[in-house]
Design a protein with these regions (language model features):
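Exported/periplasmic ABC-transporter solute-binding proteins
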Residues: 9-139, 145-155, 161-338
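N-terminal Lys/Arg-rich, disordered targeting/topogenic segments
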Residues: 1-11
Length: 338
């Protein structure tokens, strides 16, 4: 009897041990499987994140990097002319497309109107300037030349006053009123009681063409007093910035010249003028880029429309408008069109 009980007890013990071992094995299996699956998921997440990071980095590099592989030599680079405000742009193009060691001081530039004359007379292949004036379009017509005008960078036509002037904003109607002679005192537009001295530029200058087409449009621009007609953009800035003589003055130019370019010429004088906001919008790179600044315009590539796709002018124009060309323009401080 005792032996039977002993054997029964041993059997029960064995069964319990087997059950425990099986339970431990099953538990261990599920634990290991769970840990393994979790590890796989973690690795997958890490790999996915790494892939995304690499993609983002590559995309940033694509935006920032500019190829500097030479595409021309100085001898075969097309003949180019430019206005004063676009010469830094054309210099940047030639440095990138030919090579950084180009001595741009030796390039043969004139200015806006002479540049148009040279293009119409087939003395240059391409010009980078403001839009053509009525006189320049008429000259081209007389010579049997049709001009093709292509925006290359965005630009803003700006008005500026002495930094001590209390007026910060004007409306488009007020600007027209000042330059038509209907508004003659700053108190009429929220300023001090002093006569307005509006400077102008000569006919066929880039600034004057912009003033007529962008600002005055169908409204007649008043004839300027002799002392208010100034031959260069720099001279107007000098006059307006003067504490004694410029407090009541207003002038106009293009955003790039009035900011980036002139600050490089004389930072102290540039600090004595301020740009006027138009219809509540101040001119800056952002408002010019998105078009919210009312007098947003462009600088243009101008070529002979008869030039074919393989011509030096059209090949260079296409390169200036390419991703590489637009990045060159942006790095030079201009607002790209693309």
């Amino acid at each position: 009897m005792k032996n039977r009980m002993k054997k029964g007890s041993s059997m029960i013990t064995l069964i319990v041990v087997i059950v425990l071992v099986v339970a431990l094995c099953v538990g261990a299996y599920f634990l290991v499987s769970s840990l393994y699956e979790k590890k796989l998921n973690q690795n997958g997440d890490v790999n996915n994140n790494s892939s995304q990071d690499n993609t983002q980095d590559t995309s940033k590099n694509d935006e920032e990097e500019i190829s500097s592989e030479p595409l021309y030599t100085l001898d075969n680079y097309p003949k180019v002319d430019a206005s004063l405000a676009t010469q830094p742009l054309t210099n940047a193009f030639i440095k990138n497309f030919v090579g950084e060691d180009v001595d741009v001081s030796k390039l043969d530039y004139t200015n806006t109107h002479p540049g148009y004359v040279r293009l119409i007379n087939d003395e240059v292949d391409l010009i980078v300037v403001t839009e053509p004036s009525k006189e320049e379009l008429e000259l081209a017509k007389q010579k049997g030349v049709e001009l093709e005008v292509i925006p290359v960078v965005k630009e803003g036509f700006v008005f500026y006053v002495n930094s001590n002037n209390k007026v910060d904003y004007l409306t488009k109607d007020q600007i027209q009123g000042i330059y038509s002679g209907e508004i003659t005192n700053w108190k009429e537009v929220g300023g001090e009681d002093m006569e307005i001295k509006p400077f102008q530029r000569p006919t066929n200058s880039g600034s004057q063409t912009g003033m007529l087409s962008l600002v005055m449009k169908d409204k007649k621009l008043m004839d300027p007093l002799k002392e208010n007609l100034v031959s260069t953009m720099a001279q107007i800035i000098n006059f307006v910035s003067s504490y004694e003589n410029g407090k009541n003055s207003i002038g106009y130019s293009y955003y790039y010249y009035a900011t980036t370019m002139y600050e490089g010429i004389d930072k102290e004088i540039a600090s004595n003028i301020k740009l006027i906001g138009i219809d509540g919008v101040k001119p800056n790179a952002k408002t010019i880029q998105n078009g919210s600044y009312p007098y947003t315009t462009a600088y243009y590539i101008v070529i002979n429309k008869a030039d074919d796709e393989n011509s030096p002018s059209r090949k260079l124009a296409n390169l200036m408008l390419s991703k590489r060309g637009q990045q060159v323009a942006k790095n030079a401080g201009y607002v790209p069109v693309k």
